[in-house]
Design a protein with these regions (language model features):
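Glycine-rich adenosyl-nucleotide cofactor-binding module
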Residues: 60-84, 378-410, 416
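Active-site-adjacent "gating/activation" loops or surface patches in catalytic cores
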Residues: 94, 98-106, 356-398, 409
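DnaQ-like (DEDDh/DEDDy) 3′-5′ exonuclease domain used for proofreading
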Residues: 1-94, 105-117, 126, 285, ...
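Conserved proline-anchored active-site loop of SAM-dependent methyltransferases
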Residues: 91-106, 157, 411-426
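Non-catalytic substrate-recognition/targeting regions of SAM-dependent transferases
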Residues: 44, 49, 318-380
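Conserved Class I SAM-dependent methyltransferase catalytic core
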Residues: 118-171
Length: 436
């Protein structure tokens, strides 16, 4: 990616404080990395951090020594701050999330309209290059942007972090498109933002937790109905019947699989159950029987194949007990149920739902790289901090932090803004560094 000023350091921080007043504007905003090397070295040399204060449960007090286990917030030019603390934190940060200026008409990049994009790219390049040095080998950086600069930012980050370390471009639904016709005939209304995700080392990086979308169960079922999509979880096993031991086979590792048949089982459709027992209240029927509602699948597995070959029973319902060697039930005795002569595997509704503290049942679904379930409405009021523009939902930051870090890991955000990243990191028992 080539652009004017690429081989320079942008001297100012490009905030409104730097650009709005003549006496704060640098004489020469760009320093060439070859011609002005000495001046750049002086500019980026470590600075003395002053006015240090510690905030804890005992209030605020001045300190003269910093404990690395403490969280850190620095107020000042973020480029200079990063170079100042680099020696202490290089290779120690598990996650970097930033939400930089989007380089729109509302931002402060006004040096030269002709080179507006180049100025922004120089600004980002200077910061991303030093940010990479902070990441641990298994760390990741996520940068949020809109479609204005996303294509250019992607190529820039490919250059800095390596194309092989690109993981995802996550699309986030940030607002409702609405019914206004203001864009009609020219373009579609933009209601998405994007998060570019890169690892430090692709071989060392692993996603921590697969992000999940959540929706109240009955709302989800109603949505499918409106879209003409059938909902599969409609069978309820009300009685597991009499369980009889049939024998034992071995899995591929030689571990035992115990086989059973079930006689006198009772299965009913959820709609019939709602009519018979709940006066037609379908929600009540689902909520009361969530652990007994199922669908079946013919998904292939080595265990199912062994069961189909060995099971000599004409019972409609059969089951096995075994101990998985991998997966979420690793090392635990696990029961699988099968239906019919083809031994279709039971899949339980309870495995894709969970109950909240207030009694709601939410349906879970892998979010993938389309995050359209996060509410941006009234986000400016979250945390009792009013921030009219650019504030991100706490649920977004929670998802990102869960995705790429563990407890006690360090999370860095050098475009703090409303400090949502720091607030969520603290709630999730992560250490944080913030620069604003």
């Amino acid at each position: 990616l080539d652009f004017p000023y690429k081989d320079t350091i942008l001297k100012a921080s490009m905030s409104k404080e730097d650009t709005d007043e003549d006496d704060l504007r640098p004489d020469e905003p760009f320093l060439n990395e070859v011609i002005a090397k000495e001046e750049i070295d002086v500019l980026l040399d470590k600075k003395i951090l002053v006015n240090a204060k510690k905030y804890d449960e005992n209030g605020v007090r001045e300190i003269d020594r910093f404990d690395e286990n403490d969280n850190l917030i620095i107020k000042g030019n973020n480029l200079l701050a990063l170079h100042t603390i680099k020696e202490r934190y290089a290779g120690k940060v598990k996650l970097i999330y930033i939400d930089p200026p989007y380089n729109t008409g509302n931002d402060s990049f006004k040096y030269n309209d002709k080179f507006n994009r180049s100025t922004w790219l120089t600004f980002m390049k200077n910061r991303l290059e030093i940010a990479r040095e902070f990441l641990s080998k298994d760390g990741a950086i996520l940068v949020q942007c809109d479609d204005n600069e996303q294509p250019y930012l992607k190529v820039l980050m490919d250059e800095i972090f390596g194309e092989e370390n690109f993981k995802n471009m996550i699309t986030v639904k940030a607002k409702v498109a609405g019914v206004s016709g203001s864009h009609q005939g020219r373009s579609l209304q933009n209601n998405c933002e994007y998060i570019l995700m890169y690892s430090k080392d692709s071989e060392e990086f692993f996603i921590n937790i697969t992000p999940q979308k959540e929706q109240e169960l009955m709302q989800y079922i109603e949505k499918l109905k409106e879209e003409g999509i059938s909902w599969k979880y409609v069978q309820v096993i009300t009685d597991f019947g009499e369980r009889k031991y049939l024998g034992e086979i071995k899995d591929g590792s030689g571990n035992p699989i115990k086989m059973y048949e079930h006689r006198n089982t009772e299965i009913i459709n959820i709609n019939e159950l709602a009519k018979e027992k709940y006066n037609g209240d379908l929600k009540k029927a689902y909520y009361d029987n969530i652990d007994r509602i199922f669908d079946t699948t013919n998904a292939q597995s080595s265990i199912r194949k062994r069961v189909m070959e060995a099971m000599k029973s004409n019972a409609d319902i059969t089951s096995i007990d075994y101990v998985p060697t991998t997966g979420r039930n690793k090392g635990k005795v696990t029961t699988l149920f099968y239906k019919g002569p083809k031994r279709r595997l039971f899949t339980w509704l309870s495995d894709i739902t969970y109950k909240t503290s207030d009694g709601k049942i939410l349906r879970k679904e892998n979010a993938g790289n389309l995050w359209d379930d996060l509410q941006y409405n009234n986000v400016n009021k979250e945390g009792n901090i009013s921030f009219s523009n650019g504030k991100k939902p706490e649920k977004l930051l929670k998802r990102i932090i869960e995705l790429c870090s563990d407890e006690n890991d360090i999370v860095l955000d050098f475009f703090m803004g409303s400090a949502t990243t720091q607030a969520v990191a603290m709630k999730m028992n992560r250490r944080f560094i913030g620069v604003e």
